[in-house]
Amino acid sequence: MKKTLGILLTAAFLAAGCRSLAPVYNIENKTVVLGSGVTMEQAILAGGAAKRWTMSAVRPGLIKGHLYTRGHEVTVNIPYTQNSYSIEYASSDNMRYNAKKHKIHPKYNQWVRNLDLAISREAARVH
């Protein structure tokens, strides 16, 4: 009885500490209306900075975003045009990414949604 109880408690503890993986969330060609005097590149760079992402322009039309927080690391590619952008998973560390199932720790999706909202906010600003 004690052994069974111990096994059940251990299993419950492990299950409580593990979050299930979620499908990787990508933003595909999101169209935005830019505020006066704002470029898409400016909106992406400012939106990333607002959410503590390190953003770097790779070439015209492509920005790479990198986030490192509490031992977790993610990198996204952000291709963009004059009035749209995408956020695409590039790589991660310590996020339990499963390439075959294209699944990842759910925090990744939350970070991408927050980045998306920040970019949209910056795009709508009037400078």
Describe the role of every protein-language-model region.
Residues 2-8:
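Sec-dependent signal peptide recognition
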Residues 14-17:
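C-terminal motif of bacterial Sec signal peptides marking the signal peptidase cleavage site
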Residues 19-127:
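Ser/Thr-rich, low-complexity intrinsically disordered terminal regions
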